[in-house]
């Protein structure tokens, strides 16, 4: 049986030397953004990590192998809609490998693989969480909760994001993170970012002002206190869209999704694309900017964490 996880040589060497490495998810390439924005986002994120002094490690399933440090050819495979790449959460990895499939990795899958590989910092756009109820949907129905939350509770990885995706129930997601014991740190903010928008109205108890402060928290959490949960580092988006504009677009998109019977893994990309159309591309521009910003911050944190361990 071939090894299910393959590390690119640059990633392997950096980890062996105790150097800074940042994992990057690839569902944004396979499903999250349309061409050519998907590849642009991946390349900008990798460049931002390198500019911060760390090694980027895009995680993907390529021809049945979990690759840590996917190269440009692999990313181009995932970016091609004609190849119909799957969307891999953590639970899907074994089955997709067995079937020899290609897949972009979600936050849950990327965090799981990063932890397995020994990578402690991971950059993404926004995490999944508790989905909103569509208008008219009964509250007593089964809640749609992303596996990202459960994986954050068991993978000791710092996930750098612009908070939960704006299409979610942010208050319920924040409560779930608290229940699961996942610390949430605001990056120079005391308010949970709302992905496209810099404020959600949800206060954060803890904030850090720089990468060194974040690294100290991570070391204490994992090493001194022996905690196993991940840590969410929430970074406000650099090109924020007014919250009321985003909320109006989400409300309309939720009704449309319900009318079309769109559920499960298809909901998030559908809603994100609908919000982008409704905001005349402003949301997509904000998405690209925050992805790059998060990758840069993650690179800084990885460098500080590696220096702290030296």
Curated annotation (Swiss-Prot):
SUPFAM superfamilies: Indigoidine synthase A-like
List of residues binding substrate: 87, 107, 146-148
One Gene Ontology term, aspect cellular component: cytoplasm
Domain of life: Bacteria
Known cofactor(s): Mn(2+)
Active site: 25 (proton donor), 165 (nucleophile)
Subunit structure comment from the entry: Homotrimer.
Annotated family: Belongs to the pseudouridine-5'-phosphate glycosidase family.
The protein, known as: Pseudouridine-5'-phosphate glycosidase
């Amino acid at each position: 049986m071939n090894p299910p996880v393959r590390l690119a040589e640059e990633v392997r060497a950096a980890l062996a030397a105790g150097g800074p490495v940042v994992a990057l998810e690839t569902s944004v390439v396979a499903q999250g953004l349309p061409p050519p924005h998907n590849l642009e986002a991946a390349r900008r994120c990798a460049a931002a990590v390198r500019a911060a002094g760390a090694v980027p490690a895009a995680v993907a399933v390529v021809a049945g192998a979990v690759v840590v440090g996917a190269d440009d050819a692999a990313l181009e495979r995932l970016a091609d809609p004609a190849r119909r790449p799957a969307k891999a959460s953590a639970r899907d990895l074994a089955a997709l490998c067995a079937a020899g499939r290609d897949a972009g990795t979600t936050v849950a899958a990327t965090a799981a693989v990063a932890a397995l590989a020994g990578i402690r910092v991971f950059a993404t756009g926004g995490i999944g969480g508790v989905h909103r109820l569509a208008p008219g949907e009964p509250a007593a129905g089964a809640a749609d909760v992303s596996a990202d939350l459960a994986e954050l509770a068991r993978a000791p990885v710092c996930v750098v994001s612009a908070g939960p995706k704006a299409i979610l129930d942010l208050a319920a997601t924040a409560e779930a993170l608290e229940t699961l014991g996942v610390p949430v740190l605001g990056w120079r903010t005391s308010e949970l970012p709302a992905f496209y928008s810099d404020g959600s109205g949800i206060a954060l108890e803890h904030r850090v002002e720089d990468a060194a402060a974040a690294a100290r928290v991570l070391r204490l959490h994992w090493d001194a206190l022996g905690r196993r949960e991940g840590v969410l580092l929430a970074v406000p988006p650099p090109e924020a869209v007014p919250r009321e504009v985003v909320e109006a677009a989400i409300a309309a998109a939720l009704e449309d999704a319900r009318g079309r019977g769109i559920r499960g893994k298809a909901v998030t990309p559908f809603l994100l694309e609908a919000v982008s159309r409704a905001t005349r591309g402003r949301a997509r521009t904000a998405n690209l900017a925050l992805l790059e910003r998060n990758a840069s911050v993650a690179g800084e944190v990885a460098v500080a964490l590696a220096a702290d361990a030296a």
